[in-house]
Amino acid sequence: MSATDRYSHQLLYATVRQRLLDDIAQGVYQAGQQIPTENELCTQYNVSRITIRKAISDLVADGVLIRWQGKGTFVQSQKVENALLTVSGFTDFGVSQGKATKEKVIEQERVSAAPFCEKLNIPGNSEVFHLCRVMYLDKEPLFIDSSWIPLSRYPDFDEIYVEGSSTYQLFQERFDTRVVSDKKTIDIFAATRPQAKWLKCELGEPLFRISKIAFDQNDKPVHVSELFCRANRITLTIDNKRH
């Protein structure tokens, strides 16, 4: 390939890349939406497959697009920053991001407190309310939240709670309990089939698993929870201050 040909190819590639970026910025292709196939883009832009492939590969490397094996190439959802030291409910978190929140309950039941009695400081023969929800930010699934709430401390919480209500608001209004601190641990977890379905990700895709114990104004445990979120959808920020 001559120097002139290489220069011409680079111009075509840069033009196609920019046009794809412009289409994404203008909402032609929205977050989570599949872009046309390489063949379709070749026809649309009247360029070779090599040019299209390079433009797409660069946008994948930049985190603008994501390839799903066997499915195609999709517009990557914008990452959400989550400060690890923030103690707030999901509704407050959505407000801080300037985005609409929604939840879908996928499981709720009374279960034995035995696996959680030490963390919650409750008798092993008591019960907890298990609440599992998919949490959405601007209609995109952000994470799965599984919580276990001690019914010995918050009687009939499972009957008071209705889908869409804020659990932290219920704690405060019905039980005079304010969540003021929590302890979190983080590890990486491979997405199971049900998690992949709800989070719209690949089976085995890396997820952040954030395990949490929340405490009230009297330093008593309020609930334990596990959050599973796609590692490529969220940025975790640790803000340390020296006193």
Swiss-Prot record:
Q: Which residue spans does the record list as DNA-binding?
A: 38-57
UniProt keyword Transcription, yes or no? yes
Molecular functions (GO terms)? DNA binding; DNA-binding transcription factor activity
Which signals induce this protein? Answer: Induced by fructoselysine. Makes part of the frl operon with FrlA, FrlB, FrlC and FrlD.
Pathway listed for it is: Carbohydrate metabolism; fructoselysine degradation [regulation]
Q: Name one GO biological process term.
A: negative regulation of DNA-templated transcription
Q: Which residues form the HTH gntR-type domain?
A: 10-78
Q: Which CDD domains match?
A: WHTH_GntR
Recite the UniProt keywords alphabetically.
Answer: DNA-binding, Repressor, Transcription, Transcription regulation
Q: Look up the domain of life of the source.
A: Bacteria
Concerning Pfam families, the annotation shows: GntR (PF00392), UTRA (PF07702)
- Asked whether the UniProt record includes Transcription regulation among its keywords, one would answer yes
**Coiled-coil stretches, from where to where?**
none
Q: What does this protein do?
A: May regulate the transcription of the frlABCDR operon, involved in the utilization of fructoselysine and psicoselysine.
Q: What is this protein called?
A: Probable fructoselysine utilization operon transcriptional repressor
Which organism is this protein's natural source?
Answer: Escherichia coli (strain K12)
